[in-house]
Amino acid sequence: MISKQSIRLRDVNVADLDTILAINNNSGESILPIDRARMARFLEIARYFRVAEINGQVAGFLIALTPEADYDSPNFTWFKAHYPEFVYIDRVVMTPDHRRSGIGRLFYADVLSFAEVRQPILVTEVFTQPRDDVSLLFFKTQGFVEAGEQTLPNGRRVSLMCKSLIPYAFVRETYLSRPDAVLPAWAWQDRLNLRPKLKLIA
């Protein structure tokens, strides 16, 4: 286990692109490989795109999107067809020597904190054919439940999973449904800053 003090989570930047692409495409069958153009596209559409640094080196990353993203993933499309609001974890990937070191749980805590004041559910998918028991165990023990299944064009089967975010109900009722309420900036600002209409507390 790596000590928490040695890990830094930060927003991605363009200089990280080649590193994260290599990490993604050398992660085995649980993560689908993509090309550089598709990875670069995430820089434009992902509200949450953070990397974990250890001693100045990128050790992993997590990408999450919300429904307005222009993204053609069949799993993202499935969630858009079934839920009007959500934060979708597209992928969380670590280098081989940093797997099962606690970085995934740090990422999960961070994206959960991001999601629960913005959307009512957090969603993702896990491969069930071939079966990814590491991811299934992780998400099931974090309170995710299966919302559906589908077979991808490549023939692989996935479990589509979601987790209700109870804190969002408070945000919606206290701030978003009241025109006179002021929502603190940290609860709506993100790397794309797509919600400027909400009033800001400096």
Listing of model-derived features with the role each one plays in the protein:
Residues 4-20:
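A short beta-loop-alpha structural element at the N-terminal edge
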